A protein has these predicted regions:
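P-loop (Walker A) phosphate-binding loop of NTP-binding proteins
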Residues: 9-11
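ATP-dependent small-molecule kinase phosphotransfer cores
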Residues: 35-96, 102-103
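Walker A/P-loop
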Residues: 17
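The feature captures the helix immediately C-terminal to the Walker
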Residues: 20-21
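Pre-Walker A (Motif I) flank of P-loop NTPase domains
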Residues: 2-6
């Protein structure tokens, strides 16, 4: 089978990363595209494995240089997919998996209409709230912003 791009998208806390990790563990012909972000690492996250952690200036330099397939601001931080990451995975003969937020997925589909997009619905609003709370990585104000954005994305 010809390698393809699989785009998993959902609101923050929707379950896309959990699904991506399960897929990567179950299949040897799937590779993960590591996203870039300006947010600080969460406990246990590693640069180049979970994300490419960039400064705001470095992120902007790469945007201007056209290195991103997609990028967006979410929860006060910038996130994006480096074209080189997709090329790396597909070039190794593997299917590439992205787990990205909803606006980024729209941008990818505009630029790569042959990609397969899966929108991941959280089981319920209550579960989504609990997932974000259990992360314990955000302030209540930031969590409210993420939940408001999630509501918009789920209604879109």
């Amino acid at each position: 089978m010809t390698p393809f791009l699989l785009v998993l998208s959902s609101p923050s806390g929707g379950g896309k990363t959990t699904i991506a990790r399960s897929l990567l563990q179950a299949r040897t012909d799937v590779g993960y595209s590591v996203s870039a972000t300006t947010r600080p690492p969460r406990p246990g996250e590693r640069d180049g494995h979970d994300y490419h952690f960039l400064t705001g200036a470095e992120f902007e330099r790469r945007v201007v240089a056209g290195e991103f397939l997609e990028h967006a601001t979410y929860g006060g931080h910038r996130y994006g997919t480096l074209r080189a990451e997709i090329d790396r995975v597909l070039g190794n003969g593997c299917h590439a998996v992205l787990d990205i937020e909803v606006e980024g997925a729209r941008q990818v589909m505009d630029r790569m209409p042959d990609a397969v997009r899966v929108f991941v619905l959280p089981p319920s609003a209550k579960v989504l709230v609990e997932r974000l709370r259990s992360r314990d990585t955000e302030t209540p104000a930031t969590r409210r912003v993420r939940l408001a954005r999630a509501a918009e994305e789920l209604l879109a």
